[in-house]
Amino acid sequence: FLADGTIFETLEYDFATLEERFREIAFLNKGLHITIEDQRDDENLKKSEFCFEGGLNSFVEFLNQNKEKIHPAPIYIEKDGEVPVEIAIQYTTAYSENIYTFVNNINTIEGGTHLEGFKRGITKVFNDYARAHNILKEKDSNLLGEDIREGMTAVISVKVKEPQFEGQTKTKLGNSNVTGIVQAMVVEVLAPFLEENPSVAKAILEKCISASRARE
C-alpha cells in the first residue's frame, strides 16, 4: 500500500520501525515467512527476513537473550476454543516484569482483560502449588501477584472474534468474557506442567519467595 498524502503529514517510511513490526508478526504466527526490503537507496539497500518455527517461545528467547535465565526453556501453554490462547513464559534473575499482550496480532500496550485473566490465573497456580507441596506453610501468607511476576518475561496472544478496544489509544482489550477464559486456561494447563516439571516449579518459587521476603 501507499500512504495517502492528503491524510498523513509524512509519507516517509522508517525501515527500522517496519522491521520491528514484521519481526513481531513473524513471532506471533509460527512458521510465517516475512521478507522486508528497502530499495530506495541503491547504495544502501536493506533486507531482513523473519521466520520463527518456535513462535512465542522464540519471541521470549529473543526478549531474554541478554538476561540470566532461571530455567533454560520458556514454558509454553496453549488452548483452542471460543478464544484461542497462547502464552510463553520464562523467568530471569531480573527484578522487573516484562509482559507483552496481543489480540489478533495487535499489540495491546495498555493490557486489558486478557492480561487480567493471566495475572489471576498465574497467581492462583503458583500459590496452590506452593501450598500443596508445603513450600508455603500454613502460617505463611499467600504470595502476591507482584512477587510471582518478578523477573517474568511473558508473551500472551489471544484471538477474539469481535474485540472491543478501550483507552486513549484503543490499545486495551475490554471484552469482559476474556478474563475468565484466560484465567481458566492458565489454571488448567499450567498447573499440570508444574507437577510434571518440579525442578522448574521449585526454581521459580524460590525466586517468588525471595521477592516476597525482600518486599516485607
What are these regions (language model features)?
Residues 1-216:
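GHKL-family ATPase ATP-binding module
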